[in-house]
Amino acid sequence: MNETNVNNNNQSNEEVEEINDEFKLYYDGLQESKHMKYYTNSFKSYENKQHKRVSSTLVPLKSEDLQSIRINTIHILAWKLNLMAVSYNSKFIFTAESDVINVRNIDNPNIIIKTFAMDTMEMTINQIRLGILDGEEVLVSVDEGGFVRIIFVNDFEREVIRLYNHGVSTWGIAICPSKPLIAVSSNSHKITIWNLDDENPQETKFLLPKHKHNIPSIDFSPCGNYLVSVSIDKNIRIWDVNKRQLLRIQTLAQWCWACRWIDLTTKEDQLYQYYNNSSNSRDNNNNNSNSNNNGGGGIIIDKSWRGLTQHEEQQLVENNQEVEPMPEEEEEEEEEEVNQVDNDDEIFQENDDNEENEENTEFLNEANDGVDDDDDLIIQNGVFTNEDDIIFDGGLPPINQHQQQQQQNQEIEEEGQEGQEEQEDGTENENNQGTIATTTTTTTTIINSIKKLEDAINQQRIENNRINSKVPLDKNKLPSNVVFSTYQNLYLSDVEMDLLLTMNNAIPTSFPIIQTQIDRIAFLEVVPELSLVIAASQGPARLISLYRIVKQIPLNNNINNNENNNNENNDNNLNEPETNMFLESVLSPPSGGPGLIVGLSVVKNYVKNNPLAFSINLYVMYINGIFINFHIKRSTIRNKPIHQNSTFFDPINKCNIFGLDITSFGV
């Protein structure tokens, strides 16, 4: 018995040394997947009938750390969402610190240029987001009290626009690039949309009230006609903003945290126009960079947008405090009738036993964020586990298979030890029999819980399919794809939400950690020009992964043609490009070990008449004040697999100009 314990201790020490070695390799900046103990794996939850095989044709990216500095004057709160943004001309850093927003010089971030006092009754800011609002660069903030603020980046002296979300803790922000629309999502389980072109946008706002839990992230499509939202209720929804109608819904097995549209268009004229518009806009911004000392130096657009006055906002706050809230069900029915939102989703009505969870509590309370209130949490190896793996037709993900095998091996070993103890001590034998009985009961409970959860999810999917089938979609009018995340996984989906590409354990790590609800992928950005998806974890992993999207004709496109000649649908499917996503690299953390990520911002760099030279600056801020600037670009433009049918094919360098869905061009 003692010898066995010694062997086990030696084995444990060896494992610790191995982990430490990998930990050292990791922090030495060796970010290749071979150094990762837990690495990302992709799963498809749909059946690929043609067994298509694809390969990457994208130029690898090159990442360089241009700047790494510690900001000593910063005071950012933990467990919020994104609290940092960088202006598009890379001149200013915006940091949300408690209830104020500080503007810092990017060359010396310790210098505060201006402070915006939000005048929000000291309500702490939950998130800020920078974007283009109907052609103008703005910064939007939301906070615990439902106060919404819009700052004009190109004119700091311009009056800040005030909007009010009725005292509800607000988290998600969506900025429409092509229309004057601002949307926010909150702990009221509703999405609020304002049209700033209206004379009184606060009165004409409308709601999308279908979610049944807090909504951390929303995003407008580039055209502004559609919106995607994700929620702690484990649902991702796609909305028609103009009709105020739910178009699609998909239910997952984990809390959802972030979402973005990514339009992998196959229309080259649209791509060319998009590039030219972006390039011209950047040129104009640069030409005006020295003309305005009070802001970001871009184009100042004179729009008659208005929000609330301070007096009007104060009156709304007082009225909101005086009026007793109506019951949740009556409130939703009234809002749905006023807003003419499609009410064909009775399966999402609130349950009485969930009423206690409808208070305006924070998303990100570290103390209560690790345990879900639903029945999908079971105990496995003494750890609460969310059984996400049942959504995959291919069985358990590898990590869960490994855990399951470890549990089985442990049970076998325990049974062998119990048999030995049986021969040595009769009293211990009785105890061991009790342990075996308890283990058997626990195993049965786990199996029953899994079956119960699987039945519930299957029933949910049936209802989702029923709802989805009632609203036909015109794919030509919709962006092609959405990217979204849960606390552990990353997803790429078509707009119909029936083809999910899942990256399990999407943030690799070189040291073993039990990934919990706290390890959430809360930061998500997309760069279509590089076919790039940037995902960052706010939890224990605290790392940033770079994913690439490729869409191309299968290599074995002609296989099984004879078998499918009598099936027109199969013939058509054989000619369709297939979309895939893969992990390309993981960015090195700052020296001294990573801290909690509190902000992530992307700035695009266009080069006139040379789209191959397109690059981005990825800015990352940690709670310990470390601020990093990564420069990411194509590693080379030569020796690249080519697709000569594309009008963007460059015969000199023998490569395609864009990484955006390049291999589907000309098909």
From Swiss-Prot:
Pfam families: WD40. PROSITE patterns: WD_REPEATS_1, WD_REPEATS_2, WD_REPEATS_REGION. Residues 278-301, 316-345, 389-440 are annotated as: Disordered. Gene3D superfamilies: YVTN repeat-like/Quinoprotein amine dehydrogenase. InterPro entries: GATA_zinc_finger (IPR053019), WD40/YVTN_repeat-like_dom_sf (IPR015943), WD40_repeat_CS (IPR019775), WD40_repeat_dom_sf (IPR036322), WD40_rpt (IPR001680). Residues 325-345, 411-428 have a biased composition (Acidic residues). SMART domains: WD40. Keywords: Repeat, WD repeat. It comes from the Eukaryota. Residues 278-293, 400-410, 429-440 have a biased composition (Low complexity). WD repeats lie at residues 165-204, 210-249. This is WD40 repeat-containing protein DDB_G0271002. The lineage of its organism: Eukaryota, Amoebozoa, Evosea, Eumycetozoa, Dictyostelia.
